[in-house]
Curated annotation (Swiss-Prot):
Alphabetically ordered keywords of this record: Acetylation, ADP-ribosylation, Antibiotic, Antimicrobial, Chromosome, DNA-binding, Glycoprotein, Hydroxylation, Isopeptide bond, Methylation, Nucleosome core, Nucleus, Phosphoprotein, Ubl conjugation
UniProt modified residues of type ADP-ribosylserine: 7
Protein name per Swiss-Prot or TrEMBL: Histone H2B type 1
Modified residues (Phosphothreonine): 115
MF term (GO), any: protein heterodimerization activity
Organism: Rattus norvegicus
Length: 125
């Protein structure tokens, strides 16, 4: 009597294997495009603020959308550099854009954190 085929145990929920190549119809392998996201950085900030708190993949997707949206809005304020006949957006233009885009207290916190980050960066050079 033939032995029943051994089946592999089902992978644990949430575990994902990195697939770098996908099989094409004609047998050739092609590289799968990489999706860029801010999830690594969002996770690092979360652990700095609340070390014992986790985040779901759905919430991470929302945070990624939020960061992309804010980035696009700040980049959209490039007219601030254009007014001064400049082709480069400096930290000053970004600061002004943040003040225009974010409401009240949120803008104040964002500006202070941004200033702190720029100061840390320039002092490390």
């Amino acid at each position: 009597m033939p032995e029943p085929a051994k089946s592999r145990p089902a992978p644990k929920k949430g575990s994902k294997k990195a697939v770098t190549k996908a099989q094409k119809k004609d047998g050739k392998e092609r590289k799968r495009s990489r999706k860029e996201s801010y999830s690594v950085y969002v996770y690092k900030v979360l652990k700095q603020v609340h070390p014992d708190t986790g985040i779901s993949s759905k919430a991470m997707g929302i945070m990624n959308s939020f960061v992309n949206d804010i980035f696009e809005r700040i980049a959209g304020e490039r007219r601030l550099a254009h007014y001064n006949k400049r082709s480069t957006i400096t930290s000053r233009e970004i600061q002004t854009a943040v003040r225009l885009l974010l409401p009240g207290e949120l803008a104040k916190h964002a500006v202070s954190e941004g200033t702190k980050a720029v100061t840390k960066y320039t002092s490390s050079k």
